[in-house]
Amino acid sequence: MRRTLFILALAAVVAVAAGATALGATHVSTVDPTGFSARVDNPWFPLQPGTTYVYTGTKDGKPARDVLQVTHRTATIDGAPCVVVKDRLYLSGRLEERTTDWYTQDRKGNVWYFGEQTSSALDKSGKPVTTGTWKAGVDGAKPGIYMFANPRVGQQAQQEFYKGQAEDHFQVLSLRSPVTVPYVSSKNALLTKEWTPLEPGVLDHKLYVRGIGTVLEEAVKGGTERLALVSVHRGA
């Protein structure tokens, strides 16, 4: 019951945030853990099990390669069934970070982010750095909307919340943004901006192509990261 009430409250907060834009009246969604599915087929962020996305570019001034794999595994996080996504980031050919992400979708088609388990380069004591790791329902961590079912310009939401560790937000900027990456070109990409109060002055843009998902991520302020989609392999 605690989980259900919490997610209802969070949905209301997200709805109010979206309604506070020029889109019109606010509304409250009545979602709960039983209303989620590990089948994520939102056209702007589809997560079909067996699919592998490969991105290349630069990060922190180094050649970067990011491999994102949608597994056939599911996990129950704070009562909600989530698809398990593995993410491996290589810098200058060396594995820099491993991340396990948990996503789920509500009945309306919104994609929710329920947490991540992160392990990056070793610290001075030889232990892997796990900063940014969080799981909905643990130690006050809360899930957030990662992608709207029907994105509209001006919509915004908090994607995650674990105080002092994970506080990303995003806002829809355009539904007709041109983009060209090695894998695809489109004149109707979805453009968003992302930011976090934990890194003031840092702003990222992401572009999504319908039916594919994320095709480009780049820092536009306070960073040098740029990762573009180069291949998509859809396995069994």
Language-model features and meaning:
Residues 25-236:
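Conserved functional acidic sites
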Residues 1-9:
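Bacterial N-terminal signal peptides that target proteins for export
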Residues 16-26:
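C-terminal region of N-terminal signal peptides and the immediate post-cleavage residues
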